[in-house]
């Protein structure tokens, strides 16, 4: 064999070897199956590092936590949530609270949490003390809701404050899976979103953009303290608002509720008075009125 041929053979083998190595490394990062690796563990807490913090207002922020590898995904079914745990001074045992990420498994390498810090909120206040590079203990997935495309014809949602997070997760999944996007989800969605002041309306720009993009999604805002010229709802969410804005009781509809406990209690009574099936103390997937 000539020196030229030998050199070409060596180069070819080097290229093939490099390609095989790249495939093996890629397979390792993707969990060996060609699919992104899911990192959530439903039985054990894991530490995730705070990567970014974006302050939306004086008491609301989006926390971005890094996953171990840039190709990893959280592995959170649509409609489910995660548990956050922390040891907090003055508390006799570890505090655990549930949150729904506003990101999805379509976004690899991280997950985002939208959190409002309440004066009496243990985990929400703890999050405000975290610095970039600090760890947060996370476990999941958990929850009775697992959304599947076309599980019902029409969904009516009532959200208050940060109760918008599980709703947004489902709304975005539905719109991503529309026929125009290569999917098959034709579910209609109507959302009543209640807040105290205009500045309390979280993720309003994103919601408005989704309304523009999708004619199967509508939002009705309700404010306790509306500004001059406000055209949305005023005060608390009423049975009349529900009757006018959300789907009427039927076998193929679902009402979803998420918000402060007093609001949820009132909405359970309101929906029952309008003929929807009475909400259970602990919701199940098949329930007509589902409380997160």
UniProtKB/Swiss-Prot annotation:
Pathway the protein takes part in? Protein modification; peptidyl-diphthamide biosynthesis
Reported cofactor(s): FAD
Keyword field contains Oxidoreductase? yes
Q: Which reaction does it catalyse?
A: 2 Fe(III)-[cytochrome b5] + NADH = 2 Fe(II)-[cytochrome b5] + NAD(+) + H(+); 2 Fe(3+)-[Dph3] + NADH = 2 Fe(2+)-[Dph3] + NAD(+) + H(+)
Q: Name one GO cellular component term.
A: mitochondrial outer membrane
Note the InterPro entries from the entry: CBR-like (IPR001834), Cbr1-like_FAD-bd_dom (IPR008333), FAD-bd_FR_type (IPR017927), Flavoprot_Pyr_Nucl_cyt_Rdtase (IPR001709), FNR_nucleotide-bd (IPR039261), OxRdtase_FAD/NAD-bd (IPR001433), Riboflavin_synthase-like_b-brl (IPR017938)
Instruction: Tell me the keywords, alphabetical order.
Output: FAD, Flavoprotein, Membrane, Mitochondrion, Mitochondrion outer membrane, NAD, Oxidoreductase, Transferase, Transmembrane, Transmembrane helix
Gene Ontology biological process? protein histidyl modification to diphthamide; tRNA wobble base 5-methoxycarbonylmethyl-2-thiouridinylation
Q: Which residues form the FAD-binding FR-type domain?
A: 43-148
Q: Which residues cross the membrane?
A: 12-32
The record's section on PROSITE patterns has:
FAD_FR
Subunit and partners: Monomer. Component of the 2-(3-amino-3-carboxypropyl)histidine synthase complex composed of dph1, dph2, dph3 and a NADH-dependent reductase, predominantly cbr1.
**Function as written in the Swiss-Prot or TrEMBL entry:** NADH-dependent reductase for dph3 and cytochrome b5. Required for the first step of diphthamide biosynthesis, a post-translational modification of histidine which occurs in elongation factor 2. Dph1 and dph2 transfer a 3-amino-3-carboxypropyl (ACP) group from S-adenosyl-L-methionine (SAM) to a histidine residue, the reaction is assisted by a reduction system comprising dph3 and a NADH-dependent reductase, predominantly cbr1. By reducing dph3, also involved in the formation of the tRNA wobble base modification mcm5s 2U (5-methoxycarbonylmethyl-2-thiouridine), mediated by the elongator complex.
Q: Mind telling me what this protein is named? A: NADH-cytochrome b5 reductase 1
Tell me what organism the protein belongs to. Aspergillus oryzae (strain ATCC 42149 / RIB 40)
